Amino acid sequence: MNHETSLALAANEGEERKHEHWPMMSFTFPSRLYTIADTLGRPELSFLDLTQKICAGGARLLQLRVKELPTREFLPIAHEVRAICRQTGCVLIINDRADIALAVDAEGVHVGQEDLPLEAARKVLGPDKLVGVSTHDPAQALAAERGGADYIGFGPLFGTSTKATGYNARGLDQLREIRALVRPPIVAIGGITTERAPAALAAGADAVAMISDVVLASDVTAKVREVLEKVKEA
């Protein structure tokens, strides 16, 4: 589906939605910085080391993204990350794995377009946990809202080398379009740096997800503090 077709479908759905009753969203991001613990590119750091450094910088929202480990190795890591997050008051979201999120009592799960469907993730976690959904165009964002997503991820906003999404950079204009169409909070992701974060927030994102700029920093804790100050001013 090209951008023009997607936008037209989204606009039609948006018009139809005006006549429906939509509940007020109940979730808000605890921070404008959405950190992601992914050790790709930092083989010398364990997930626990990285989590400790991120949380020490004052992060209040962290997604644990573990792609390369089998479940029996992932689970104990998730338990330990959960303990660090509880000690520091950081909300923990597990990437992709609703079963792991349930097992460690994380606050929620984040799923992509090729992962466990939103409805299935909700059945696994129940109504009291968060389910976030990655989207890449207006139609996907509206589908996530209709499905009851607590928040919507949108991107890649800019070019990114961290994760191969199969989608071209979406840009700030399309972020503005998404913001005008949906009510749930939006986290922008993809190529976002400390310098680009304010522009993403000004375009309608409620939070910005950062991986490379944080994880690859020589001092991860100091970088988190720097970004938190930057987004506070935006």
Specify the residue positions occupied by each region the protein language model found.
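Short, electropositive alpha-helical surface patch
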Residues: A205-D213
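Leucine-biased recognition of intrinsically disordered, low-complexity hydrophobic segments
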Residues: L7-L9
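Conserved N-terminal beta1-alpha1 strand-loop-helix module at the mouth
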Residues: E20-D115, K123-D150, Y167, E177, ...
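Glycine/threonine-rich flexible loop motifs
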Residues: K163-A164
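Glycine-rich adenosine-cofactor-binding loop
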Residues: G171, A188-T193
